[in-house]
């Protein structure tokens, strides 16, 4: 989803429609696979700014897989040290397996490293399980 220009506003009510739709899509999702490039040892500022507009109550219990890309292995822990605490704040249900890929792990934007591909497959299975649990809990709450 392209948020378009204008994402840099300070208040949610000032978001232009494309950005407001992005935030609404995040809040209404059954699950999220979130990813960010890593710059200077942290997630991208605009990535964080998008989540500054998200209502924490709408993310509570949402299944999430955490992913990131960066210039090398020295950025790999950003997923655990930055993304996991952010989504912990939202009380999201995060898959235990996260995925980080560097330039040596991809060719033309596709994962080519066997170990990274295996982590991706594991994270997908975990996300499916979290979705199943989320649906059972949701059905119980609706009854």
Segments from the language model and where they lie:
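N-terminal beta1-alpha1-beta2 submodule of the flavodoxin-like/Rossmannoid cofactor-binding fold
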Residues: 1-55, 118-121, 125, 129, ...
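Short connector loops at secondary-structure junctions
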Residues: 1-6, 99-106
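Residue-level signature of the cytosolic catalytic core of signaling kinases
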Residues: 15-18, 79, 112
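Secondary-structure boundary/capping motif
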Residues: 42-43, 74-75, 108
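Juxtamembrane helix-loop transition sites at the ends of transmembrane segments
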Residues: 51, 84, 109-112
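Short, conserved loop/helix-junction motifs that constitute active-site signature segments
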Residues: 56-60
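Polytopic transmembrane helical bundles with strong interfacial aromatic enrichment
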Residues: 107-110, 122
């Amino acid at each position: 989803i392209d948020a378009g220009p204008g994402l840099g506003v300070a208040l949610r009510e000032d978001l232009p429609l494309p950005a407001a739709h992005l935030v609404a899509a995040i809040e209404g999702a059954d699950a999220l696979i979130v990813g960010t490039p890593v710059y200077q040892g942290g997630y991208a500022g605009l990535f964080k700014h998008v989540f500054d507009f998200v209502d924490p109550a709408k993310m509570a219990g949402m299944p999430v897989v955490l992913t990131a890309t960066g210039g090398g292995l020295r950025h790999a822990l950003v997923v655990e040290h930055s993304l996991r605490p952010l989504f912990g704040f939202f009380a999201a249900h995060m898959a235990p397996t996260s995925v980080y890929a560097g330039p040596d792990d991809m060719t033309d934007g596709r994962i080519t490293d066997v170990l990274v591909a295996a982590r991706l497959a594991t994270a997908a299975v975990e996300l499916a399980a979290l979705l199943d649990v989320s649906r059972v809990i949701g059905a119980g709450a609706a009854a």
